[in-house]
Amino acid sequence: MRSSASRLSSFSSRDSLWNRMPDQISVSEFIAETTEDYNSPTTSSFTTRLHNCRNTVTLLEEALDQDRTALQKVKKSVKAIYNSGQDHVQNEENYAQVLDKFGSNFLSRDNPDLGTAFVKFSTLTKELSTLLKNLLQGLSHNVIFTLDSLLKGDLKGVKGDLKKPFDKAWKDYEMKFTKIEKEKREHAKQHGMIRTEITGAEIAEEMEKERRLFQLQMCEYLIKVNEIKTKKGVDLLQNLIKYYHAQCNFFQDGLKTADKLKQYIEKLAADLYNIKQTQDEEKKQLTALRDLIKSSLQLDPKEVGGLYVPSRANSDSQSRQGGYSMHQLQGNKEYGSEKKGFLLKKSDGIRKVWQRRKCAVKNGILTISHATSNRQPAKLNLLTCQVKPNAEDKKSFDLISHNRTYHFQAEDEQDYVAWISVLTNSKEEALTMAFRGEQSTGENSLEDLTKAIIEDVQRLPGNDICCDCGSSEPTWLSTNLGILTCIECSGIHREMGVHISRIQSLELDKLGTSELLLAKNVGNNSFNDIMEANLPSPSPKPTPSSDMTVRKEYITAKYVDHRFSRKTCASSSAKLNELLEAIKSRDLLALIQVYAEGVELMEPLLEPGQELGETALHLAVRTADQTSLHLVDFLVQNCGNLDKQTSVGNTVLHYCSMYGKPECLKLLLRSKPTVDIVNQNGETALDIAKRLKATQCEDLLSQAKSGKFNPHVHVEYEWNLRQDEMDESDDDLDDKPSPIKKERSPRPQSFCHSSSISPQDKLALPGFSTPRDKQRLSYGAFTNQIFVSTSTDLPTSPTSEAPPLPPRNAGKGPTGPPSTLPLGTQTSSGSSTLSKKRSPPPPPGHKRTLSDPPSPLPHGPPNKGAIPWGNDVGPSSSSKTANKFEGLSQQASTSSAKTALGPRVLPKLPQKVALRKTETSHHLSLDRANIPPETFQKSSQLSELPQKPPLGDLPPKPMELAPKPQIGELPPKPGELPPKPQLGDLPPKPQLSDLPPKPQMKDLPPKPQLGDLLAKSQASDLSAKVQPPSEVTQRSHTGDLSPNVQSRDAIQKQASEDSNDLTPTLPETPVPLPRKINTGKNKVRRVKTIYDCQADNDDELTFIEGEVIIVTGEEDQEWWIGHIEGQPERKGVFPVSFVHILSD
């Protein structure tokens, strides 16, 4: 028995005790057994339950000891809260007192309005601190006092104190029982009998007193336990309810107190703006007066305002050096290192005129604005520049950069001194910052990126006015919606709560790039096209002069009720389908549309994903890259529950760790999801990151778990900012001695794709790359005009192939059929089966640029140099250069016989002038002599392509109806995909030095006359007829060569043609005036897109198959101008071959 008791006392866990000791007695059983024993001691079985009572008391004592320990910790924590709250109240009272005194100082002076504001804020702080003091009193009375009473009363002492009387009664009973048992055995032994056991009935009367004492102490113990249970359970919770009501009153009263100042705060914000303007004006006047007085005190002409100006002799010697001098100028520090204003800049063009330009110096960068506001300003890093005064003109100075010299002139001598001082000081400051280390440089670069993003956001359509009331220059951003509002409307956005709109200031808050994702991709116009599509008439939309009541009613209806949004889905399943499509197509505006229709963003998708129960956010994270983070950000900020789990228990945090998405993880952790949720494998997201060695995800999750994660975080994202080069000049735009505009830099070929392809497959297509890779891919995939399937065992898709975009760089028209580079050099092995609509390619002779002039080709018969592939006798001299990428003929061989590609008949060339000379048309050429032959190795299995039908003389006129191509008329898809090329097989990326020099204005020929055009046309035809016999013979035998040898010979021959293409006997091509863009049409033209198209430049239009475009003008016959029907903000130029003209 004693050994059993010792085993019981060794247990420490309540659960293990209850599980290992089944022989217990409940209170009801104890009452029944004791009552029966009291009424009939001889027949009672109470003695058999004594051990059960002992076990029960032991377990209850263990439970009470655990509760005592837990309640002591609770009391300690609550007391710490109370003490820190008292300190906080005291600090708030001190703050309010000092603020009130500071405001009183203003009241006694000449700024009573500011003093009143400080006093009101002091009063607000006092009232809030009083409310907090009341809350702390409630915490003390309701929680601390209750815990104190319980721990110092019934639970006082240590483990075992409560059951000491019970233990004594048990001990007495045992001793008496042992004594009687011994006597009975001795008595039986005297009579020659052996007693094995003694029944309770035999000793019932003898043990009655001890049994009654045991029962009494058991009752006392159970009564005590019952009282403790009531106090630690029901009573404590009732007091916590009282404290909850005190908390509710605290927050409600605090909100009421703050609301009292709301109207005053709104008025104060406007008054502060006016006061600041007045103070700025005073400062400006004082600064001007200071400068005037300072200039009158200058006596030595060689030392102006502390700025050392070298003598004329020294200046002359320095100007003759033409480089950097050993000793730099020392600027007057009083002028600082930042300045904005206007300078006259001498152009480097033909006329050498002075042009007034807005300039700004900040952070070691000189910014020079262009004459046209739609161009990014040029930026010069002053660390690589030198300022040199002009000895001949006291108001002029030169700025020598690494590649050119800028000539500036100030308005007067004082302004001249200021500019030179600021430039010198800013350069010195930037140099000091550079020497401090990389950390400050990184911070500055991140700040510069943030500023550039904000500037780009402010240039988005509609962002120049408030999204809700139309006030100009809004500076308050809703980070979860991507819109800009004014300060009045932003206050109402704050009232609605962060679950509706999260407001930040573009000017006052320090934003991270993660908070600008949606702002960069939405814009006020795009957002209102959805959220204000069904505005009633008359419109309830407020104006800049509307009062706060009107604004609040409208904004609440717009953002909370979505009353004015466009409705496109009739059922919840349709909404979920639209949500899925929006994520798959990465269409943020489509996502906003389903959000406006009230879809539950965290509902499981209807289409099964990697795991059952995937939500849109799971899918967006799983398929995310640096171009789709804005979709993830929108879902994270606008869905209610980030802890939604899939069927196997994975949250979105688990997905980030599983698929290695640290940038998505940053966006998620900003909204503080639960980081310790486990999946069915018992793993948290942090466990998965550690197991998969996802270091970035592990670090971020560890920071979040320890509470050290910074929500203003930077994310790696393809921002696609419209920034020009640092040292770009605007002289080509400003001088304008002739109508020829500066050529654009080489751009990559556009690639189109079927609308049925997933985003992953689109990314695998050649040429479909991020802007970072676009330039590199453009050379390897430039002439790809045919896409083939990567799987030969799948049937041909009924969707036919799209044509390539008409190239948009000026070049000469070819006279022979163009060939394509080997498909193996361009097609990714990871792409899925891809078959597209194939239409005749546009004439390669025209490549669109800003400076394309009309063509001199005469109307009537086609170019005589156009020869089918089967009868190729070589290109004419006027087409050699243009065919650098297109002149490599392909030859596909089979196991039985060689198969030549069928003839392809091109449409007639549009009437354009071949603008550039041969030596200026090399901007896309590669050094073909250095390209390995493997680069141009052709596929060993290409099915024969049928001959294409002729298109007719010319593309259809803009007002004529172009018939939509039928599936049956289109040629079949090639057979087998060649092997994927290795990295070493690709041609080298062209360097800047390989590009041709920019044509100067003086090199351009004069305006052409009609006779010159006819003479040029005749000379062109004549040169096509007269070909050297050796060249014809050589080209006729290329079919007998192996593919590798043929490709190498073609490359070397093309390179030699490029170098010897100048023909002195031919007259130089005249340059006419550029064709005017035709925008005046009496009837609205509508065209329907029949392919997908991804824009390569900002002025081009991105669209998908099936959209309708309103034509607003023509840039030329191959490129038209227009916008998507119903979405005027989506506008730009588009290729004619990608659309079908509608009859209406």
From Swiss-Prot:
Gene3D superfamilies, alphabetized: 1.25.40.950, Ankyrin repeat-containing domain, Arf GTPase activating protein, Arfaptin homology (AH) domain/BAR domain, Pleckstrin-homology domain (PH domain)/Phosphotyrosine-binding domain (PTB), SH3 Domains
Posttranslational modification: Phosphorylated on tyrosine residues by SRC.
Listed Polar residues bias regions: 312-330, 747-759, 1030-1049
First and last residues of each zinc finger (C4-type): 466-489
Modified residues (Phosphotyrosine): 308
Post-translational modification Phosphothreonine, affected residues: 1063
Arf-GAP domain mapped to chain residues: 451-574
Stretches with biased composition (Basic and acidic residues): 735-746, 916-926
PROSITE patterns attached to this UniProt entry: ANK_REP_REGION (PS50297), ANK_REPEAT (PS50088), ARFGAP (PS50115), PH_DOMAIN (PS50003), SH3 (PS50002)
Main localization, broad class: cytoplasm
Residue stretches making up the SH3 domain: 1082-1144
Superkingdom, taxonomy of origin: Eukaryota
Span of domain PH: 336-428
Record's compositionally biased regions (Acidic residues): 725-734
GO CC annotation terms, alphabetical: dendritic spine; glutamatergic synapse; Golgi membrane; podosome; trans-Golgi network membrane
Disulphide linkage map: none
Low complexity bias: start-end ranges: 790-800, 821-834, 889-900
Keywords: ANK repeat, Cilium biogenesis/degradation, Cytoplasm, Golgi apparatus, GTPase activation, Membrane, Metal-binding, Phosphoprotein, Repeat, SH3 domain, Zinc, Zinc-finger
UniProt xrefs under InterPro entries: AH/BAR_dom_sf (IPR027267), Ankyrin_rpt (IPR002110), Ankyrin_rpt-contain_sf (IPR036770), ARFGAP/RecO (IPR037278), ArfGAP_dom (IPR001164), ArfGAP_dom_sf (IPR038508), ASAP (IPR043593), ASAP1_BAR (IPR037928)
Subcellular location: Cytoplasm; Membrane; Golgi apparatus; Golgi apparatus, trans-Golgi network
Activity regulation: Activity stimulated by phosphatidylinositol 4,5-bisphosphate (PIP2).
Subunit structure: Homodimer. Interacts with SRC and CRK. Interacts with RAB11FIP3. Interacts with PTK2B/PYK2. Interacts with CTTN. Interacts (via SH3 domain) with APC. Interacts with REPS2; the interaction is direct. Forms a complex containing RAB11A, ASAP1, RAB3IP, RAP11FIP3 and ARF4; the complex promotes preciliary trafficking; the complex binds to RHO in photoreceptor cells and promotes RHO ciliary transport.
Role: Possesses phosphatidylinositol 4,5-bisphosphate-dependent GTPase-activating protein activity for ARF1 (ADP ribosylation factor 1) and ARF5 and a lesser activity towards ARF6. May coordinate membrane trafficking with cell growth or actin cytoskeleton remodeling by binding to both SRC and PIP2. May function as a signal transduction protein involved in the differentiation of fibroblasts into adipocytes and possibly other cell types.
Domain notes: The PH domain most probably contributes to the phosphoinositide-dependent regulation of ADP ribosylation factors.
Name recorded for this polypeptide: Arf-GAP with SH3 domain, ANK repeat and PH domain-containing protein 1
The species this protein was found in: Rattus norvegicus (Rat)
